[in-house]
Amino acid sequence: MSADITETPAWQALSDHHAEIGDRHLTELFADDPARGTELALTVGDLYIDYSKHRVTRRTLDLLVDLARAAGLEERRDAMFAGEHINTSEDRAVLHTALRLPRDAKLVVDGQDVVADVHDVLDRMGDFTDRLRSGEWTGATGERITTVVNIGIGGSDLGPVMVYDALRHYADAGISARFVSNVDPADLVAKLDGLEPAKTLFIVASKTFSTLETLTNATAARRWLTDALGDAAVAKHSSRCPPTRSWSTKFGINTDNMFGFWDWVGGRYSVDSAIGLSVMAVIGKERFAEFLAGFHIVDEHFRTAPLHQNAPALLGLIGLWYSNFFGAQSRAVLPYSNDLSRFAAYLQQLTMESNGKSVRADGTPVSTDTGEIFWGEPGTNGQHAFYQLLHQGTRLVPADFIGFSQPTDDLPTADGTGSMHDLLMSNFFAQTQVLAFGKTADAIASEGTPADVVPHKVMPGNRPTTSILATKLTPSVVGQLIALYEHQVFTEGVIWGIDSFDQWGVELGKTQAKALLPVLTGDKSPAAQSDTSTDALVRRYRTERGRPA
C-alpha cells in the first residue's frame, strides 16, 4: 500500500498554511508583494503564463513544491518519460510524449525502438495526405477528394475536431473536414448533408474498434457510399486509424490506408498520433510537424525545469490547492478566441476521464477529493451567460483565461476607428482584473448609487485566475497548450496517488447498453428489469416505438 499523501507532514503544513492565509484578499496580496505581477509568471515556448492572480503567496508555492516532492512527482515524471509501466491497472507504459519526439531521439521501450515506429507512421501519413492534397489520390470516379469525414468518439473525435477548428486558417489544399461521433443518427445525417460521395473520404478512428458508436456510424457511412458508388469504391474512399486488419478487409479498406498506434497511447492523448490524420489532411504534414514540435517544447520544459519554474507542475499544484484546501469543485476554461471554441470540451475528457477516480493506484480508497470539473465557453460569450456566478456567486471557480496578441481574423469596430480584436482582448484583461480585485461598497456608494442598490453591485473580487497569453494561434501554440494541460493532469494524479491513464468507469455502461439493446428491440414483451425505474422506462420506450410492453 502506498503512503496516503494526506497523512504526510507536507499536506499538514499546507493545511496549516491555508488556515493562516485562506481568507486573505488578492488586493492585500498585491499590496504586500507588488512585484508578484511580473515575478509570478513564466514564459514557456510561445506561452506567457501569469499566475499572480491566484490566492497564493511565495510561501504557498514553496509548500506546494514540498508536497510534490513528498508525492514523488519528479520520480514519477521521469518514469513516464522513460517508458516505465506507470499505468499500473493495465500494466502499460504511458508514452504520448513519444509521439512528438524528434526523429533523431532515442527511446527503446519493451525492446522496441519507439521513435522509429512513430516516425514510420508519420511518414506514411504524410505520403498519404500529400497525395490527397495534391489531387494525385482520387476517388472511384477519378474526382479529387474535397472532404474528409472523421468517424470516432471520445479521444478519436474531441481532439481532432478541436484542433481542426483551431487551425482552420491553415487549410490550404481545398480539403475540409467534418466529424461524426454520436450514435444518434441525426449526427451522421447532418454531417453527410450536402456532400458528394465521389469527393468524400471517411477516416474510421478508434483505438480498439470495440466502440459501438464508431462501428455503427462507420457501417452506416459505408452504406451511404456504396449506395452511390458500389462496393468497390470503399477502398478509394476510406482509411482506418489504427489498423484492425480482419475488420478493415471485410469493410473494404485498402491496407495501404491504415495507420497504427500503440497501447501506450491513451485515446484522450492521441490527437498527435494517427488519430490526427484528418487534421494532417487539411493543414498538411509540415504544419502537423509544427503542431508536434509545440507539444515537445512543453514536454521538455516539464521534464527538465525545476518545480518552482515548471509551469505545468505549478498550475497543477495550484489547481489541487483550490480543490483540496478551498473546496473548489470546478475550473472554468475561457479562451478569448472563437477558434478555440471546442477547447473546454476537449479538456473535459482529458482531465475528467484521467483524474475522475475514487481509488488510488494500489486499489485503496482515496482520502480526499480528486478530479477537477472542467467547463467553459469562449469569451465574450461566457460574459453574457455565466460570468455573473463567477463574479458574485457563492462558489469559488478558478478560471483560466487564454488569449492572443495577434488575431487570426480582424475587423474594424462599429465606429470604424478601432479593432474588434482589441475590443475582445480589452474584455480579457478587464475580466481578470475585476475578478481579482472587485469593487467595494464604498467605491460604489461614492458614485451616487442608492444605498439599497449598493449591496447588489458590490463585486467581492478575490476570484483566482491564470492568464495565458500567446502571440498568435499557430499549430505550435495549439500543441503547447494541449501539453500544458496534459502535464497538469499528470501532476495532480501523482499527488492524489491515482492512475490517471485508465478509464474503467466507462466500461460498465457500454456492457449494459449491449445487454439492453435486444430488450428494446425484441418482438416480445421483455422480462422485468432488475430495478423498477429502468423497467418502467424501457416499457414506456417500447410502447412509443410500437412494440409490446
UniProtKB/Swiss-Prot annotation:
Give the Enzyme Commission number. 5.3.1.9
Question: InterPro entries from the entry?
Answer: G6P_Isomerase, G6P_Isomerase_C, Phosphoglucose_isomerase_CS, SIS_dom_sf, SIS_PGI_1, SIS_PGI_2
**CDD domains the record matches:** SIS_PGI_1, SIS_PGI_2
Q: Where is this chain primarily localised?
A: cytoplasm
Cite the PROSITE patterns for this sequence: P_GLUCOSE_ISOMERASE_1, P_GLUCOSE_ISOMERASE_2, P_GLUCOSE_ISOMERASE_3
Cellular compartment(s): Cytoplasm
* Domain of life, source organism: Bacteria
Give the positions the UniProt entry annotates as the active site.
E353 (proton donor), H384, K510
**Record keyword Cytoplasm present:** yes
- GO BP: any one term: glycolytic process
Q: Which UniProt keywords apply?
A: Cytoplasm, Gluconeogenesis, Glycolysis, Isomerase
Please write the reaction equations for the catalytic activity of this protein. Answer: alpha-D-glucose 6-phosphate = beta-D-fructose 6-phosphate
Give the pathway annotation.
Answer: Carbohydrate biosynthesis; gluconeogenesis; Carbohydrate degradation; glycolysis; D-glyceraldehyde 3-phosphate and glycerone phosphate from D-glucose: step 2/4
Instruction: List cellular component terms (GO).
Output: cytosol
- GO terms for MF: carbohydrate derivative binding; glucose-6-phosphate isomerase activity; monosaccharide binding
Q: What does this protein do?
A: Catalyzes the reversible isomerization of glucose-6-phosphate to fructose-6-phosphate.
Q: Which NCBIfam families match?
A: PRK00179.1 (NF001211)
Xref: PANTHER family:
GLUCOSE-6-PHOSPHATE ISOMERASE (PTHR11469:SF1)
- Similarity-based family: Belongs to the GPI family.
Q: Return the protein name.
A: Glucose-6-phosphate isomerase
